[in-house]
């Protein structure tokens, strides 16, 4: 969002002649992050229609026209916030079960095609990723496919896999005592405990002149 307008990029549109037809997963992360930083949605992810005329009411609910004829609805934001909250608490619970603080983690690996294209800054802004040193965040790409290829070429890696399996800890998140409490806390943008996200608070201060104490 620049100058009160939403600027979009179409994947593979090097000529600039292709109009957007919809929004992808990484685009949703960017959109929600920008809406939040601009103050067009609040900490709960709810639209603030008084902030811009791009927010309007259609089909009985608020939405924003992010491209000509394309709308992102309040229910879309609500549903995605549940997804990002789940991602956040999985990291928190894994760290807790490992007996580690976030600053003790050497690396944060993001695997899969979604992780390959999502903006790290946007994911941190909405609280989907932890707010940590950016150089520690590693895009692992399609690690499952790469691992399968390596195993096909070198069967000796089976011994490494067996060792990893022995060292792994299985966590049933639904059985964690404070899972629901953690889930509710993580549904705020970026989190109910904003001290977990100091760099996001700094961005808000610069974009909206908001101070947190």
Residue spans for each PLM region:
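Helical "lid/coupling" subdomains associated with nucleotide-phosphate turnover
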Residues: 1-213
